């Protein structure tokens, strides 16, 4: 795509696409040409499409994380085709990547979840519906987000990144407690937990954006 045209585009759509594994036939009838043509007719000039949703599923043909591709994604080139056909019509496609909500990871790695001061996991309880379990960016989960982001940038012609759910959350997990102690902070002090949470959030986000620049 010609990247010489600068400036923020305002005919923008956010195509929310959080898709449960219980849904089958995802993108089975997707027609990239029709998709982009409809956007062009509506004079859309930018649309956010999904690489990764809150359920933790991927919508591109990941080689690094094939187990995370949506189990019922009929067209593994969904995101690639969305981008390419939009580009043919001069439509930009920034790509969505969830950060602190990822149900797939939360279920398989509870040790990466944010822990509250009273020792509970932060977010949706185990037997309630929803994917709002908060993952801690001071855990090894940080590297996972980085690797997924790197793969998206390396394999797809994206026009930008939309990192969602990037929120300061005080945490008392072992990773945060150890980190606070190393900096001379008091993990039992809420103000110290909040200060450390800001650091925990800023460091990886700056690094991810540096990958784009």
Indicate where each model-derived feature is located.
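N-terminal structural segment of carbohydrate-active enzymes
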Residues: 1-57, 84, 89-91
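The substrate-binding groove and active-site-proximal loops of carbohydrate-active enzymes
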Residues: 14-30, 60-77, 126-146, 186-201, ...
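Conserved, mostly hydrophobic/aromatic
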Residues: 39, 86, 93, 145, ...
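Aromatic-lined carbohydrate-binding/catalytic grooves of carbohydrate-active enzymes
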Residues: 40-76, 101-117, 126-127, 170-180
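Proline-aspartate-enriched helix->loop->beta-strand connector
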Residues: 44, 157-161
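Aromatic-lined carbohydrate-recognition surfaces of secreted/lumenal glycan-active proteins
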Residues: 87, 91-104, 162-166, 192-213
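Active-site-adjacent "subsite" loops/lids of carbohydrate-active enzymes
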Residues: 95, 99-156, 195, 200-203
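Conserved active-site carboxylates
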Residues: 144, 166-167
């Amino acid at each position: 795509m010609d990247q010489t045209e600068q400036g923020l585009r305002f005919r923008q759509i956010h195509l929310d696409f959080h898709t449960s594994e219980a849904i089958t036939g995802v993108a089975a009838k997707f027609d990239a040409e029709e998709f982009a043509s409809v956007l062009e007719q509506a004079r859309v000039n930018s649309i956010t499409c999904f690489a990764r949703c809150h359920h933790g599923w991927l919508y591109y043909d990941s080689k690094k994380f094939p187990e995370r591709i949506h189990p019922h994604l009929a067209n593994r080139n969904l995101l690639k085709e969305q981008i390419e056909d939009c580009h043919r019509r001069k439509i930009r496609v920034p790509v969505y990547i969830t950060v602190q909500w990822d149900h797939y990871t939360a279920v398989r790695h509870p040790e990466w979840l944010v822990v509250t001061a009273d020792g509970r996991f932060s977010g949706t309880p185990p037997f309630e519906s929803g994917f709002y379990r908060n993952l801690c960016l001071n855990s090894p989960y940080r590297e996972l987000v980085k690797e997924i982001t790197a793969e998206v940038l390396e394999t797809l012609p994206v026009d930008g990144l939309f990192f969602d759910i990037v929120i300061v959350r005080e945490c008392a997990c072992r990773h945060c407690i150890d980190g606070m102690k190393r900096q001379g902070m008091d993990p039992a002090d809420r103000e110290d937990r909040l200060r450390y949470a800001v650091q925990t959030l800023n460091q990886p986000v700056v690094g991810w954006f540096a990958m784009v620049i």
